[in-house]
A protein has these predicted regions:
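N-terminal active-site segment of His-dependent metallophosphoesterases
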Residues: 1-53, 58
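Short glycine-/acidic-enriched loop or helix-start segments at secondary-structure transitions
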Residues: 16, 46, 75-77, 161-162, ...
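Active-site neighborhood of phospho(di)ester-bond hydrolases with catalytic His/Asp-centered motifs
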Residues: 6-7, 34-38, 65-69, 152, ...
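Short, glycine/acidic-enriched loop or turn micro-motifs at the edges of active sites
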Residues: 10-12, 42, 71-72, 156, ...
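A general structural motif
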Residues: 29-31, 60-62, 147, 202-205
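Short beta-strand-to-coil "C-cap" segments at the C-terminal boundary of structured domains/repeats
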Residues: 259-262
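Active-site neighborhood of divalent metal-dependent phosphoester bond hydrolases
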Residues: 44, 48-51, 56-142, 147, ...
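Acidic, His/Gly-enriched loop-helix segments that form or flank divalent-metal centers
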Residues: 107-243, 249-253
Length: 262
């Protein structure tokens, strides 16, 4: 099977489509699928368009959607709104505002911010009736695996023999059976760091991930460009056991796309 693989489109439908066009996705007459390694929304202004596009592919059995931390954040934001924190969120005092999850919810529900704050119960109801919540989120999986690759968002779950502030990570051979809490944590990991510094890899396979800007890996492990500077290299990062794809689309105006046959 041929897989076109992207990560972190973050609500930029046109950039995603452009990447797929350049890779030959739409002209490919052989069986193929799109793998999205998480974070569909929360940056761009084309939330509805990207959701409709992915669901169209899903209806043709052409989509594999891996859950990212921003998929978790969407659900958590609605829970926090329902608990009465809508004013804090809308006023910018919450990570839901800084992460742009609040803005994605407004886009999908087509509610004005003041109306959403004044009628937060209606906002939650409308958000839970969007195609993203009802149709796309249920398609998410923690990871996808082929003979030679594992596709995830941050990284695979690991064992932490330290604590939250001084972690000591090691490979967990039973990571596939990790519970929901550990998968949620794994979606926040920096895969490049775990692979290149901690040596945590899947034996015999390459892990393809997103979540963290690839300029981090290029700068820290290759000595190329900057990290969060004027000379960031945001192309895919390749190293032993890892391919990282998050191209920081909000800055680069591109979505990284690779093609894998396996």
């Amino acid at each position: 099977m041929k897989y076109y693989v992207v990560a972190d489109p973050h609500g930029f439908y046109l950039y995603l489509r452009q990447a797929l066009e350049e890779a030959g996705f739409f002209e490919d007459n052989e069986p193929h699928k799109l793998i999205v390694c998480g974070d569909v929304l929360d940056r761009g202004e084309e939330s509805a368009e990207i959701v409709d596009f992915l669901l169209e592919l899903a209806s043709k059995d052409m989509l594999i959607l891996v859950k990212g931390n921003h998929e978790d954040l969407f659900v958590q934001c609605l829970m926090d709104i329902a608990k009465g924190y809508v004013v804090d969120i809308a006023s910018g005092c919450s990570y839901h505002y800084r992460n742009r999850t609040w803005h994605s919810i407004l886009q999908l529900t087509k509610m004005k911010e003041k109306t959403a704050v004044d009628f937060s119960g209606s906002l939650v109801t409308k958000a839970r009736n969007t195609r993203f919540y009802r149709e796309l989120l249920p398609l998410c999986r923690d990871y996808y695996e082929t003979d030679h690759y594992v596709f995830c968002h941050g990284w695979i779950p690991v064992i932490n023999n330290g604590d939250k502030y001084s972690p000591i990570f090691e490979y967990d051979p039973d990571w596939r059976n990790a519970d929901l809490t550990r998968w949620r944590e794994a979606r926040w990991y920096i895969g490049m760091q775990l692979a290149c510094e901690n040596g945590i890899k899947e034996p015999g396979k390459t892990i393809v991930c997103g979540h963290w800007h690839t300029s981090f890996g290029h700068n820290k492990y290759e000595g190329k460009g900057t990290y969060r500077g004027d000379a960031d290299d945001l192309t895919p990062f390749y190293a032993d056991g890892i391919i990282a794809l998050d191209g920081c689309t909000v800055r680069s105006k591109r979505v990284n796309c690779i093609v894998i046959e396996d």
